[in-house]
């Protein structure tokens, strides 16, 4: 984190948390890292994309659904995790509207190893278009830990514009936990950029309803 001092990061996080505690909301505010880029041409330069798992789950309320074989359906039922069988998916009959609705209902999907190859055939390209193609889960992994892994993973993806924002925490985390998540995120982002720090115009952190605090 060469260019962002721990001190300025601590100050910015303290301001974000203070602002949030002074005006409590009815929901738990997410804290985002907002990134402005420079010396980048989205038309010509390669658009970067990468995911990193943070130490502390930034979005604990993220809704995850399991497309399961019998083993995972039983585990999902026992753990109160939303799930669908292959038959449930076949009933959607590749109808675009229904698949769009399914994609909107959840933030992410997990599929049993035995099912994952069938998903494109059963559902068509709908989930892929929504950027929500399922992650695979084996019988050796617990659904709960897989769900937590997905909730802890954030994706940095360059689109057509020179700014992006990524959830890096929430106001229920401690200052130290947020420093850890944000430092990790900034380092990872810079490693994805062609010219590293020379491509970073600005870095701000803000809570959902709060004011942005500049850290770079």
UniProtKB/Swiss-Prot annotation:
Source organism superkingdom: Eukaryota
SUPFAM superfamilies: Ribosomal protein L1 (SSF56808)
GO BP annotations listed: translation
A GO CC annotation given for this chain: cytosolic large ribosomal subunit
Pfam families assigned to the protein according to its UniProt record, in alphabetical order: Ribosomal_L1 (PF00687)
Protein name: Large ribosomal subunit protein uL1
GO molecular function, one term: structural constituent of ribosome
Keyword Ribosomal protein: yes
Family, per entry: Belongs to the universal ribosomal protein uL1 family.
Cross-referenced Gene3D superfamilies: 3.30.190.20, 3.40.50.790
Key words, A-Z: Ribonucleoprotein, Ribosomal protein
């Amino acid at each position: 984190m060469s260019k962002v001092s721990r001190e300025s990061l601590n100050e910015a996080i303290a301001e974000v948390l203070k602002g949030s505690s002074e005006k409590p909301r009815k929901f738990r505010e997410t804290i985002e890292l907002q990134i402005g880029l420079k010396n980048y041409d989205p038309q010509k330069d390669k658009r970067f994309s990468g995911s990193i798992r943070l130490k502390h789950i930034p979005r604990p309320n993220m809704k995850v659904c399991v497309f399961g074989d019998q083993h995972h359906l039983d585990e999902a039922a026992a753990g109160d995790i939303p799930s669908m069988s292959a038959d449930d998916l076949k009933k959607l009959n590749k109808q675009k509207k229904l698949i769009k609705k399914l994609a909107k209902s959840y933030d992410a999907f997990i599929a049993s190893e035995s099912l994952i190859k069938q998903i494109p055939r059963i559902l068509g390209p709908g989930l892929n278009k929504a950027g929500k193609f399922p992650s695979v889960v084996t019988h050796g992994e617990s659904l709960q830990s897989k769900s937590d892994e997905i909730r802890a993973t954030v994706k940095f993806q360059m689109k057509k514009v020179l700014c992006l924002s990524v959830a890096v925490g929430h106001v229920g985390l401690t200052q130290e936990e947020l420093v850890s998540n944000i430092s990790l995120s900034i380092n990872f982002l810079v490693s994805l950029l062609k010219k590293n720090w020379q491509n970073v115009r600005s870095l701000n952190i803000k809570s959902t309803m709060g004011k942005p605090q500049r850290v770079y």
